[in-house]
Regions:
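Short, basic/hydrophobic alpha-helical segments
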Residues: 331-337
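A short acidic, glycine-rich active-site loop
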Residues: 266-267, 316-322
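Divalent-cation-assisted or electrostatically stabilized phosphate/pyrophosphate-binding catalytic cores
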Residues: 324-328
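C-terminal amphipathic alpha-helical interaction region
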Residues: 292-294
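Short glycine/proline- and charge-enriched loop/turn segments
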Residues: 307-315
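Hard-cation-handling environments
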Residues: 298, 303
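Metal-cofactor-binding active-site regions of metalloenzymes
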Residues: 1-288, 340-342, 346-358, 362-464
Length: 464
Protein backbone atom coordinates (compact mmCIF):
# COMPACT_ATOMS: atom_id res chain seq x y z
CA UNK A 1 0.00 0.00 0.00
CA UNK A 2 1.32 3.45 -0.92
CA UNK A 3 1.55 6.14 1.76
CA UNK A 4 -1.25 8.70 1.84
CA UNK A 5 -0.45 11.71 -0.37
CA UNK A 6 3.32 11.55 0.15
CA UNK A 7 6.05 13.27 -1.92
CA UNK A 8 5.33 10.94 -4.85
CA UNK A 9 1.55 11.34 -4.76
CA UNK A 10 0.03 10.46 -8.17
CA UNK A 11 3.51 9.73 -9.62
CA UNK A 12 3.41 6.08 -10.64
CA UNK A 13 6.72 5.70 -12.49
CA UNK A 14 10.35 6.68 -12.02
CA UNK A 15 10.13 8.93 -15.06
CA UNK A 16 7.11 10.73 -13.60
CA UNK A 17 8.96 11.26 -10.31
CA UNK A 18 12.00 12.66 -12.10
CA UNK A 19 9.93 15.02 -14.24
CA UNK A 20 7.95 16.31 -11.30
CA UNK A 21 10.70 16.67 -8.69
CA UNK A 22 13.37 17.97 -11.08
CA UNK A 23 11.21 20.17 -13.31
CA UNK A 24 7.55 20.86 -12.51
CA UNK A 25 7.89 21.26 -8.74
CA UNK A 26 10.28 24.21 -8.92
CA UNK A 27 8.34 26.30 -11.44
CA UNK A 28 6.48 29.48 -10.40
CA UNK A 29 2.74 29.90 -11.01
CA UNK A 30 1.07 32.08 -13.64
CA UNK A 31 -2.59 31.95 -12.59
CA UNK A 32 -4.25 33.52 -15.61
CA UNK A 33 -7.87 33.02 -14.51
CA UNK A 34 -9.28 33.27 -11.00
CA UNK A 35 -11.96 35.04 -9.01
CA UNK A 36 -9.82 36.32 -6.14
CA UNK A 37 -10.82 39.59 -4.49
CA UNK A 38 -8.16 42.24 -5.23
CA UNK A 39 -9.38 44.32 -2.27
CA UNK A 40 -8.27 41.55 0.09
CA UNK A 41 -4.86 41.46 -1.59
CA UNK A 42 -4.47 45.22 -1.30
CA UNK A 43 -5.46 45.15 2.36
CA UNK A 44 -3.27 42.07 2.92
CA UNK A 45 -6.14 40.53 4.82
CA UNK A 46 -5.51 38.17 7.71
CA UNK A 47 -8.03 35.33 7.66
CA UNK A 48 -9.62 34.75 11.06
CA UNK A 49 -9.86 30.96 10.92
CA UNK A 50 -10.11 27.93 8.62
CA UNK A 51 -13.82 28.46 8.05
CA UNK A 52 -13.28 31.95 6.67
CA UNK A 53 -10.43 30.90 4.39
CA UNK A 54 -12.06 27.66 3.20
CA UNK A 55 -15.80 28.33 3.13
CA UNK A 56 -15.99 32.06 2.52
CA UNK A 57 -17.02 31.80 -1.14
CA UNK A 58 -16.19 28.36 -2.47
CA UNK A 59 -19.26 26.86 -4.13
CA UNK A 60 -17.39 23.59 -4.80
CA UNK A 61 -17.42 23.00 -1.04
CA UNK A 62 -20.96 24.31 -0.60
CA UNK A 63 -22.32 21.81 -3.14
CA UNK A 64 -20.60 18.92 -1.37
CA UNK A 65 -21.95 20.02 2.00
CA UNK A 66 -25.48 20.28 0.60
CA UNK A 67 -25.11 16.76 -0.80
CA UNK A 68 -24.37 15.61 2.76
CA UNK A 69 -27.68 17.08 3.87
CA UNK A 70 -26.38 19.92 6.01
CA UNK A 71 -28.62 22.94 6.51
CA UNK A 72 -27.88 26.11 4.59
CA UNK A 73 -27.18 27.81 7.91
CA UNK A 74 -24.07 25.62 8.22
CA UNK A 75 -23.00 26.37 4.66
CA UNK A 76 -23.65 30.01 3.72
CA UNK A 77 -25.71 31.07 6.73
CA UNK A 78 -25.00 32.55 10.14
CA UNK A 79 -24.04 29.42 12.08
CA UNK A 80 -20.97 29.50 14.30
CA UNK A 81 -17.71 29.23 12.34
CA UNK A 82 -16.58 26.14 14.23
CA UNK A 83 -19.89 24.38 13.60
CA UNK A 84 -19.53 25.14 9.89
CA UNK A 85 -16.01 23.76 9.97
CA UNK A 86 -17.15 20.55 11.65
CA UNK A 87 -19.76 20.08 8.93
CA UNK A 88 -17.08 20.60 6.31
CA UNK A 89 -14.72 18.16 8.05
CA UNK A 90 -17.42 15.49 7.98
CA UNK A 91 -18.08 16.29 4.33
CA UNK A 92 -14.43 15.90 3.39
CA UNK A 93 -14.11 12.60 5.22
CA UNK A 94 -16.93 11.33 3.02
CA UNK A 95 -15.62 12.87 -0.22
CA UNK A 96 -13.66 9.87 -1.52
CA UNK A 97 -12.95 10.28 -5.24
CA UNK A 98 -13.86 13.97 -5.23
CA UNK A 99 -11.04 16.45 -6.02
CA UNK A 100 -12.03 18.40 -2.91
CA UNK A 101 -10.46 15.62 -0.87
CA UNK A 102 -7.08 15.96 -2.56
CA UNK A 103 -7.20 19.76 -2.74
CA UNK A 104 -8.03 20.07 0.95
CA UNK A 105 -5.14 17.86 2.01
CA UNK A 106 -2.68 19.51 -0.37
CA UNK A 107 -3.65 22.83 1.21
CA UNK A 108 -3.18 21.46 4.71
CA UNK A 109 0.24 20.07 3.76
CA UNK A 110 1.62 22.96 1.73
CA UNK A 111 0.45 25.89 3.84
CA UNK A 112 0.24 24.44 7.34
CA UNK A 113 2.59 21.44 7.28
CA UNK A 114 -0.30 19.22 8.45
CA UNK A 115 -0.26 15.63 7.15
CA UNK A 116 -3.05 14.27 9.36
CA UNK A 117 -6.17 13.49 7.29
CA UNK A 118 -9.13 15.75 8.06
CA UNK A 119 -12.10 13.99 9.62
CA UNK A 120 -14.71 14.60 12.29
CA UNK A 121 -12.37 12.89 14.77
CA UNK A 122 -9.30 15.00 13.90
CA UNK A 123 -11.16 18.25 13.26
CA UNK A 124 -10.43 19.91 16.63
CA UNK A 125 -6.71 19.13 16.48
CA UNK A 126 -6.35 20.49 12.95
CA UNK A 127 -8.53 23.53 13.73
CA UNK A 128 -6.32 24.55 16.63
CA UNK A 129 -3.05 24.00 14.77
CA UNK A 130 -4.07 25.74 11.57
CA UNK A 131 -5.80 28.66 13.27
CA UNK A 132 -2.73 29.37 15.40
CA UNK A 133 -0.69 29.72 12.20
CA UNK A 134 -3.35 31.83 10.49
CA UNK A 135 -2.81 34.49 13.16
CA UNK A 136 0.88 34.93 12.27
CA UNK A 137 2.23 37.41 9.72
CA UNK A 138 3.34 34.55 7.46
CA UNK A 139 -0.33 33.81 6.76
CA UNK A 140 -1.63 37.11 5.45
CA UNK A 141 -3.21 36.97 2.00
CA UNK A 142 -0.09 38.26 0.26
CA UNK A 143 2.12 35.73 2.01
CA UNK A 144 -0.28 32.93 1.09
CA UNK A 145 0.24 33.97 -2.54
CA UNK A 146 4.02 34.21 -2.21
CA UNK A 147 4.15 30.89 -0.36
CA UNK A 148 3.22 29.17 -3.63
CA UNK A 149 5.58 31.26 -5.79
CA UNK A 150 2.81 32.95 -7.77
CA UNK A 151 4.41 35.42 -10.17
CA UNK A 152 1.20 36.64 -11.85
CA UNK A 153 -2.49 36.33 -11.12
CA UNK A 154 -5.35 37.64 -13.22
CA UNK A 155 -8.54 38.52 -11.37
CA UNK A 156 -11.96 38.70 -13.06
CA UNK A 157 -13.25 42.25 -13.43
CA UNK A 158 -16.20 44.09 -14.94
CA UNK A 159 -15.47 46.84 -17.51
CA UNK A 160 -17.17 49.39 -15.23
CA UNK A 161 -14.82 48.61 -12.31
CA UNK A 162 -12.45 51.39 -11.29
CA UNK A 163 -9.53 48.96 -10.69
CA UNK A 164 -8.33 51.03 -7.77
CA UNK A 165 -6.93 47.94 -6.05
CA UNK A 166 -4.88 46.89 -9.07
CA UNK A 167 -3.56 50.40 -9.57
CA UNK A 168 -2.64 50.74 -5.90
CA UNK A 169 -0.89 47.36 -5.89
CA UNK A 170 1.25 48.45 -8.84
CA UNK A 171 2.74 51.12 -6.60
CA UNK A 172 3.61 48.68 -3.83
CA UNK A 173 6.54 46.33 -3.42
CA UNK A 174 4.64 43.09 -3.97
CA UNK A 175 6.47 40.38 -5.91
CA UNK A 176 3.32 38.98 -7.53
CA UNK A 177 1.78 41.04 -10.34
CA UNK A 178 -1.98 41.33 -9.80
CA UNK A 179 -3.57 42.02 -13.19
CA UNK A 180 -7.20 42.66 -14.14
CA UNK A 181 -9.07 40.56 -16.70
CA UNK A 182 -11.65 42.22 -18.93
CA UNK A 183 -14.97 40.37 -18.52
CA UNK A 184 -17.83 42.23 -20.28
CA UNK A 185 -20.55 39.61 -19.73
CA UNK A 186 -23.07 42.12 -18.43
CA UNK A 187 -22.69 44.15 -21.63
CA UNK A 188 -23.07 41.05 -23.82
CA UNK A 189 -25.99 39.30 -22.12
CA UNK A 190 -28.75 41.76 -22.98
CA UNK A 191 -31.42 39.20 -22.04
CA UNK A 192 -30.60 39.66 -18.34
CA UNK A 193 -33.18 41.68 -16.35
CA UNK A 194 -30.63 44.24 -15.16
CA UNK A 195 -29.22 45.00 -18.62
CA UNK A 196 -30.72 48.53 -18.88
CA UNK A 197 -29.33 49.45 -15.46
CA UNK A 198 -25.94 48.11 -16.47
CA UNK A 199 -25.94 50.20 -19.65
CA UNK A 200 -26.29 53.30 -17.48
CA UNK A 201 -23.49 52.14 -15.18
CA UNK A 202 -21.11 51.44 -18.06
CA UNK A 203 -21.99 54.73 -19.76
CA UNK A 204 -21.07 56.60 -16.59
CA UNK A 205 -17.77 54.72 -16.28
CA UNK A 206 -16.90 55.41 -19.92
CA UNK A 207 -18.17 59.01 -19.78
CA UNK A 208 -20.20 58.59 -22.94
CA UNK A 209 -23.78 57.93 -24.03
CA UNK A 210 -24.75 54.38 -24.98
CA UNK A 211 -27.76 54.48 -27.30
CA UNK A 212 -26.89 51.69 -29.74
CA UNK A 213 -24.86 48.52 -30.15
CA UNK A 214 -22.16 50.58 -31.86
CA UNK A 215 -22.10 52.93 -28.88
CA UNK A 216 -21.68 49.88 -26.65
CA UNK A 217 -18.59 48.83 -28.62
CA UNK A 218 -17.13 52.33 -28.31
CA UNK A 219 -17.79 52.43 -24.56
CA UNK A 220 -16.19 49.02 -24.06
CA UNK A 221 -13.23 50.09 -26.19
CA UNK A 222 -12.77 53.08 -23.90
CA UNK A 223 -12.86 50.88 -20.82
CA UNK A 224 -10.51 48.34 -22.40
CA UNK A 225 -7.96 51.13 -22.88
CA UNK A 226 -8.21 51.81 -19.16
CA UNK A 227 -7.80 48.11 -18.33
CA UNK A 228 -4.72 47.96 -20.54
CA UNK A 229 -3.21 50.83 -18.58
CA UNK A 230 -3.68 48.71 -15.45
CA UNK A 231 -1.80 45.76 -16.97
CA UNK A 232 -4.64 43.70 -18.48
CA UNK A 233 -3.40 40.86 -20.70
CA UNK A 234 -6.52 38.72 -21.05
CA UNK A 235 -10.29 38.97 -21.48
CA UNK A 236 -12.93 36.44 -20.49
CA UNK A 237 -16.43 35.63 -21.73
CA UNK A 238 -19.10 33.25 -20.49
CA UNK A 239 -21.12 31.99 -23.47
CA UNK A 240 -24.29 30.25 -22.39
CA UNK A 241 -26.51 29.97 -25.46
CA UNK A 242 -26.69 31.30 -29.00
CA UNK A 243 -23.74 33.70 -29.14
CA UNK A 244 -23.17 34.33 -32.85
CA UNK A 245 -25.47 35.12 -35.76
CA UNK A 246 -23.91 37.25 -38.53
CA UNK A 247 -25.51 40.66 -38.86
CA UNK A 248 -24.88 44.27 -39.83
CA UNK A 249 -24.27 47.09 -37.39
CA UNK A 250 -27.71 48.46 -38.23
CA UNK A 251 -29.35 45.15 -37.35
CA UNK A 252 -27.46 44.97 -34.04
CA UNK A 253 -28.51 48.54 -33.29
CA UNK A 254 -32.16 47.60 -33.90
CA UNK A 255 -31.90 44.69 -31.45
CA UNK A 256 -30.33 46.95 -28.82
CA UNK A 257 -33.03 49.59 -29.27
CA UNK A 258 -35.78 46.99 -29.04
CA UNK A 259 -34.32 45.64 -25.79
CA UNK A 260 -33.96 49.08 -24.22
CA UNK A 261 -37.58 49.80 -25.11
CA UNK A 262 -38.72 46.68 -23.29
CA UNK A 263 -39.37 44.54 -26.35
CA UNK A 264 -39.11 40.75 -26.42
CA UNK A 265 -36.17 39.28 -28.35
CA UNK A 266 -35.91 36.06 -30.32
CA UNK A 267 -32.97 33.70 -29.94
CA UNK A 268 -31.75 34.82 -33.37
CA UNK A 269 -31.84 38.47 -32.31
CA UNK A 270 -29.90 37.66 -29.15
CA UNK A 271 -27.29 35.91 -31.29
CA UNK A 272 -27.09 38.87 -33.64
CA UNK A 273 -26.36 41.39 -30.90
CA UNK A 274 -23.97 39.09 -29.06
CA UNK A 275 -22.16 38.12 -32.24
CA UNK A 276 -21.77 41.76 -33.26
CA UNK A 277 -20.41 42.73 -29.85
CA UNK A 278 -18.13 39.71 -29.44
CA UNK A 279 -16.68 40.04 -32.93
CA UNK A 280 -15.90 43.71 -32.45
CA UNK A 281 -14.38 43.00 -29.05
CA UNK A 282 -12.27 40.25 -30.60
CA UNK A 283 -10.93 42.72 -33.13
CA UNK A 284 -9.99 45.05 -30.27
CA UNK A 285 -8.26 42.23 -28.41
CA UNK A 286 -6.25 41.43 -31.53
CA UNK A 287 -5.34 45.09 -31.98
CA UNK A 288 -4.02 45.29 -28.42
CA UNK A 289 -2.50 41.78 -28.41
CA UNK A 290 -4.46 40.41 -25.47
CA UNK A 291 -5.94 36.93 -25.28
CA UNK A 292 -9.65 36.09 -25.37
CA UNK A 293 -11.00 33.30 -23.16
CA UNK A 294 -14.31 31.68 -24.08
CA UNK A 295 -15.98 29.69 -21.29
CA UNK A 296 -18.87 27.84 -22.92
CA UNK A 297 -21.83 25.76 -21.70
CA UNK A 298 -22.48 26.73 -18.11
CA UNK A 299 -26.18 26.30 -17.32
CA UNK A 300 -26.56 28.80 -14.51
CA UNK A 301 -28.95 29.35 -11.60
CA UNK A 302 -30.97 26.16 -12.10
CA UNK A 303 -32.63 26.40 -8.68
CA UNK A 304 -34.62 29.62 -8.92
CA UNK A 305 -35.63 29.29 -5.28
CA UNK A 306 -31.99 29.27 -4.15
CA UNK A 307 -31.05 31.97 -6.66
CA UNK A 308 -33.65 34.23 -5.05
CA UNK A 309 -32.26 33.39 -1.62
CA UNK A 310 -28.51 33.52 -2.27
CA UNK A 311 -27.90 35.05 -5.70
CA UNK A 312 -25.58 33.88 -8.48
CA UNK A 313 -22.38 31.82 -8.17
CA UNK A 314 -23.50 30.01 -5.04
CA UNK A 315 -23.46 26.42 -6.28
CA UNK A 316 -26.54 25.92 -8.45
CA UNK A 317 -24.94 25.80 -11.89
CA UNK A 318 -24.30 22.73 -14.05
CA UNK A 319 -23.28 21.58 -17.54
CA UNK A 320 -25.30 22.50 -20.61
CA UNK A 321 -25.52 20.35 -23.75
CA UNK A 322 -26.41 22.51 -26.77
CA UNK A 323 -24.58 22.09 -30.09
CA UNK A 324 -22.29 25.00 -30.95
CA UNK A 325 -19.45 23.78 -33.21
CA UNK A 326 -20.65 25.47 -36.45
CA UNK A 327 -21.43 28.68 -34.55
CA UNK A 328 -18.00 28.72 -32.88
CA UNK A 329 -16.23 28.02 -36.15
CA UNK A 330 -18.12 30.81 -37.91
CA UNK A 331 -17.40 33.25 -35.07
CA UNK A 332 -13.66 32.56 -35.10
CA UNK A 333 -13.56 32.63 -38.89
CA UNK A 334 -15.30 36.01 -38.98
CA UNK A 335 -12.27 37.55 -37.27
CA UNK A 336 -9.74 35.33 -39.02
CA UNK A 337 -11.02 36.45 -42.44
CA UNK A 338 -9.41 39.82 -41.74
CA UNK A 339 -6.36 38.17 -40.14
CA UNK A 340 -7.55 39.76 -36.90
CA UNK A 341 -8.38 36.77 -34.70
CA UNK A 342 -6.93 37.30 -31.22
CA UNK A 343 -5.15 34.64 -29.24
CA UNK A 344 -8.08 32.55 -27.99
CA UNK A 345 -8.52 29.94 -25.26
CA UNK A 346 -11.50 27.57 -25.63
CA UNK A 347 -13.18 25.85 -22.69
CA UNK A 348 -16.38 23.83 -22.46
CA UNK A 349 -18.01 22.78 -19.22
CA UNK A 350 -19.25 19.64 -20.98
CA UNK A 351 -16.35 17.20 -21.52
CA UNK A 352 -18.18 15.69 -24.47
CA UNK A 353 -16.99 18.75 -26.39
CA UNK A 354 -13.29 18.08 -25.78
CA UNK A 355 -12.44 16.48 -29.16
CA UNK A 356 -14.41 19.16 -30.99
CA UNK A 357 -12.62 21.99 -29.20
CA UNK A 358 -9.20 20.41 -29.64
CA UNK A 359 -9.81 20.01 -33.37
CA UNK A 360 -11.37 23.48 -33.68
CA UNK A 361 -8.28 25.07 -32.13
CA UNK A 362 -6.12 23.62 -34.89
CA UNK A 363 -8.10 25.41 -37.60
CA UNK A 364 -6.64 28.80 -36.74
CA UNK A 365 -2.87 29.19 -36.50
CA UNK A 366 -0.42 32.05 -36.93
CA UNK A 367 3.33 32.21 -37.61
CA UNK A 368 5.32 33.06 -34.50
CA UNK A 369 2.62 32.03 -32.00
CA UNK A 370 2.62 28.52 -30.60
CA UNK A 371 -0.96 27.25 -30.61
CA UNK A 372 -2.59 30.63 -31.11
CA UNK A 373 -5.98 29.07 -30.36
CA UNK A 374 -5.67 26.90 -27.27
CA UNK A 375 -7.83 24.02 -26.09
CA UNK A 376 -8.08 25.17 -22.48
CA UNK A 377 -7.47 23.12 -19.38
CA UNK A 378 -10.15 20.98 -17.74
CA UNK A 379 -12.60 23.51 -16.29
CA UNK A 380 -14.85 23.57 -13.21
CA UNK A 381 -16.71 20.25 -13.08
CA UNK A 382 -13.80 18.71 -14.99
CA UNK A 383 -10.74 19.85 -13.01
CA UNK A 384 -10.41 16.52 -11.23
CA UNK A 385 -7.90 13.73 -11.85
CA UNK A 386 -9.85 11.95 -14.57
CA UNK A 387 -10.98 15.19 -16.20
CA UNK A 388 -7.41 16.45 -16.45
CA UNK A 389 -6.14 13.12 -17.74
CA UNK A 390 -8.87 13.15 -20.39
CA UNK A 391 -8.15 16.73 -21.43
CA UNK A 392 -4.41 16.04 -21.69
CA UNK A 393 -5.00 12.85 -23.68
CA UNK A 394 -7.38 14.60 -26.08
CA UNK A 395 -5.07 17.57 -26.54
CA UNK A 396 -2.00 15.41 -27.17
CA UNK A 397 -3.94 13.17 -29.58
CA UNK A 398 -5.36 16.00 -31.70
CA UNK A 399 -3.11 19.00 -31.01
CA UNK A 400 0.29 19.78 -29.46
CA UNK A 401 0.67 19.11 -25.75
CA UNK A 402 4.11 20.76 -25.72
CA UNK A 403 2.60 24.19 -26.53
CA UNK A 404 -0.17 23.99 -23.91
CA UNK A 405 -0.49 26.97 -21.52
CA UNK A 406 -1.34 24.74 -18.57
CA UNK A 407 -3.40 25.16 -15.43
CA UNK A 408 -5.41 27.89 -13.68
CA UNK A 409 -7.27 27.90 -10.37
CA UNK A 410 -10.61 29.52 -11.37
CA UNK A 411 -11.01 29.94 -7.60
CA UNK A 412 -12.18 32.42 -5.00
CA UNK A 413 -9.91 30.96 -2.31
CA UNK A 414 -6.40 32.15 -1.46
CA UNK A 415 -5.49 28.57 -0.52
CA UNK A 416 -6.27 27.20 -3.99
CA UNK A 417 -2.86 27.49 -5.63
CA UNK A 418 -1.84 23.85 -4.91
CA UNK A 419 -4.29 22.99 -7.69
CA UNK A 420 -1.38 23.83 -9.98
CA UNK A 421 0.67 21.17 -8.20
CA UNK A 422 -2.20 18.71 -8.64
CA UNK A 423 -2.23 19.39 -12.38
CA UNK A 424 1.55 19.15 -12.66
CA UNK A 425 1.64 15.78 -10.92
CA UNK A 426 -1.04 14.46 -13.29
CA UNK A 427 0.85 15.89 -16.28
CA UNK A 428 4.14 14.28 -15.23
CA UNK A 429 2.45 10.97 -14.55
CA UNK A 430 0.84 10.99 -18.00
CA UNK A 431 4.15 11.70 -19.74
CA UNK A 432 5.94 9.19 -17.52
CA UNK A 433 3.51 6.46 -18.53
CA UNK A 434 4.11 7.13 -22.23
CA UNK A 435 7.87 6.96 -21.75
CA UNK A 436 7.89 3.81 -19.65
CA UNK A 437 5.45 2.11 -22.03
CA UNK A 438 7.96 2.68 -24.84
CA UNK A 439 5.72 5.20 -26.60
CA UNK A 440 8.25 8.06 -26.38
CA UNK A 441 12.05 8.01 -25.85
CA UNK A 442 13.47 8.64 -22.38
CA UNK A 443 15.03 11.96 -23.37
CA UNK A 444 14.70 13.38 -19.88
CA UNK A 445 16.38 16.72 -20.50
CA UNK A 446 14.01 17.47 -23.37
CA UNK A 447 11.01 16.24 -21.40
CA UNK A 448 11.94 18.29 -18.34
CA UNK A 449 12.07 21.41 -20.49
CA UNK A 450 8.66 20.52 -21.94
CA UNK A 451 7.19 20.07 -18.46
CA UNK A 452 8.65 23.41 -17.34
CA UNK A 453 7.09 25.07 -20.37
CA UNK A 454 3.64 23.59 -19.81
CA UNK A 455 3.80 24.38 -16.10
CA UNK A 456 4.76 28.04 -16.52
CA UNK A 457 6.84 29.26 -19.46
CA UNK A 458 4.22 28.75 -22.16
CA UNK A 459 1.71 30.89 -20.25
CA UNK A 460 4.28 33.65 -19.82
CA UNK A 461 5.04 33.64 -23.54
CA UNK A 462 1.36 33.47 -24.50
CA UNK A 463 -0.01 36.19 -22.25
CA UNK A 464 2.97 38.54 -21.92
Amino acid sequence: MKPFMDADFLLQTDTAKTLYHEAAEKMPIFDYHNHLNPQEILEDRQMENLTRVWLGGDHYKWRAMRAMGFSEDLITGNADDYDKYLAFAETIENAIGNPLYHWTHLELQRYFGITTPLSRATAKELWDEANAKLQTKEFTVRNLILNQHVSHLCTTDDPADDLHCHLALQKEDFACRVLPSFRPDRAVHLEKPDFPEYVEKLAAAASRTIASAEDMVHALSCRLDFFLSAGCVVSDHSLEGCFYVPCTAAEANDVFENRMNGGALTEKELGMYKGFLLTNLGLLYHKHNIAMQLHIKALRNNSKRMFRALGADTGFDSMNDFAFAPMLGAFLNDMDEDDALPKTVLYSLNPGDNPMLASMAGNFAAPGIRSKVQFGTAWWFNDHKYGMESQLATLSSIGMLSTFIGMLTDSRSFLSFPRHEYFRRILCNQIGNWVENGEYPANLEFLKEMVENISYNNAVSYFL
